[in-house]
Regions:
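Basic, flexible linker segments flanking DNA-binding modules
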Residues: 1-91, 182, 236-245
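RNase H-like polynucleotidyl transferase catalytic core
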Residues: 68-73, 150-155, 170-188, 204-209
Length: 255
């Protein structure tokens, strides 16, 4: 087998690649849990016009390839696709998560997302979050955003409580319960939960609840205001919401 002299003598131009190396390194340090696609979109949003293949080559040379865990947290499923709403506040999925402090004390998070633009509306953190606390969190959200048409949830005790049912009835909010053992029927927030688990709960050791809250608040600001979402045409949730609130801004203005 013979090789052309051009291929045989090729040496990478490290000086030419230096700006790409620097930009990728800075982005990877700023967003340590991002894979290649997200990092590439970060560079694009910074105005970098480097070729996709070139950036990927350097990404691999820098060994930034995201390591996947050998064991999956959830089994492979065939989820039923959810219909994305056409406007804000049509559908809010809500859910609980669990984790623990370094001392072993367990805490819970109450998560609220808007299906329309995947915006995380709240992550409430405490040792215990009863139904009354759930209602207070929802009141805090609707004070700035308005009431949703419906909320989608599982059959947890706080969510099937009379307290939440009365709140929903008073404000004309429909409660939609998924079937027991079918988390894929709430797929949008399940995906959000996985991202939050991977990038925050599994990534940090929390000594106090306040530490968990502060780190989560910083992450929420990044998630809503900086992170491009493929499902939103690589806009951030805040950009997508602004586009919906300002009809004269066409989608092409964000591309």
């Amino acid at each position: 087998m013979s090789l052309s002299r051009t291929v045989f003598r090729y040496q990478p131009d490290t000086q030419r690649d230096e700006p790409v190396i620097m930009a990728l390194t800075v982005a990877a340090e700023r967003y340590p849990r991002y894979g290649f696609k997200k990092l590439f979109q970060v560079l694009r949003r910074q105005g970098k016009s480097w070729n996709h293949k070139r950036v990927h080559r350097i990404y691999c040379l820098l060994k930034l390839n995201f390591r996947r865990k050998g064991k999956q947290r959830l089994p492979v499923r065939n989820p039923v696709p959810l219909v994305t709403p056409e406007a804000m506040n049509q559908s809010w999925p809500i859910d609980f998560m669990h984790d623990a402090l370094v001392c072993g004390r367990r805490f819970r998070t109450f998560n609220v997302v808007d299906d329309f633009n995947r915006e995380a509306l709240a992550i409430e953190i405490d040792l215990n979050i009863p139904a009354q606390r759930v209602v207070r969190v929802l009141d805090r959200i609707v004070a700035n955003r308005g009431y949703p048409l419906k909320m989608r949830m599982d059959n947890g005790p706080e969510l099937v409580s009379l307290t939440l049912a009365q709140w929903a009835e008073e404000h004309g909010v429909m409660l939609e319960f998924i079937r027991p053992g079918k988390p894929t029927q709430n797929a949008f927030i399940e995906r959000f939960n996985r991202t939050y688990r991977t990038e925050i709960l599994d990534f940090y050791l929390f000594r106090t609840l306040n530490e968990a809250r502060e780190i989560t608040e910083r992450w929420l600001a990044e998630y809503n205001g900086e992170r491009p979402h493929e499902s939103l045409n690589n806009l951030t949730p805040e950009e997508y919401r602004l586009m919906a609130e300002t009809p004269e801004i066409s989608k092409s203005a964000w591309n």
